[in-house]
């Protein structure tokens, strides 16, 4: 998997969409700050520089749209597992939000690249490590 580390970006998901043709089958982009982070249904993801883990993963090897949407569940459960290993008790507000002590600390946004068939899946994760 190719790793791309950036200081600042509009959106890690949007970056992967723009660069799709130039990237290998799997890629991950991280940024210290996003200027236009977003969640589902166009909700704004507020973030401050160096206070969040911001990353998006590109997987080009999806061919069925129904499999692509399972990535939300997989990513959400993976973050819960990571937090559990650090003894942080978190809960899931399905389908894509993670809470600790009643505060949202993580959002996951899965998007597809269609042209016109499914060409890839992008999984964006924003984790507020200071909440």
Model-identified regions with their sequence ranges:
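Short glycine- and Lys/Arg-enriched binding-loop motifs that mark or flank ligand-binding interfaces
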Residues: 33-38, 98, 103, 120-122
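Asparagine-centered polar/low-complexity signal
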Residues: 13, 52, 96, 128-131
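Short, glycine/acidic-enriched loop or turn micro-motifs at the edges of active sites
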Residues: 10, 35-36, 100, 127-129
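Solvent-exposed residues in well-ordered beta-strands and their adjoining turns
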Residues: 58-62, 111, 128-130
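Short, acidic (Asp/Glu-rich) active-site segment that either coordinates a divalent metal cofactor
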Residues: 117-131
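Acidic (Asp/Glu) carboxylate-rich active-site/surface patches
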Residues: 81-116, 126
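N-terminal lobe of the biotin/lipoate ligase/transferase fold
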Residues: 1-88, 106
């Amino acid at each position: 998997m190719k790793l791309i580390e950036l200081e600042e970006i509009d959106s890690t998901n949007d970056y992967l969409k723009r660069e799709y043709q130039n990237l290998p089958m799997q890629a991950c982009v991280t940024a210290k700050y996003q200027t236009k982070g977003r969640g589902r249904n166009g909700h704004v993801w507020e973030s401050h520089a160096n206070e969040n883990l911001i990353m998006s993963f590109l997987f080009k090897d999806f061919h069925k749209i129904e499999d692509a949407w399972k990535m939300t569940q997989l990513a959400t459960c993976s973050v819960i597992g990571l937090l559990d290993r650090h003894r942080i008790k978190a809960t899931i507000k399905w389908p894509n939000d993670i809470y600790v002590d009643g505060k949202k600390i993580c959002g996951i946004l899965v998007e597809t690249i269609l042209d016109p068939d499914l060409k890839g899946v992008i999984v964006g994760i924003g984790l507020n490590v200071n909440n």
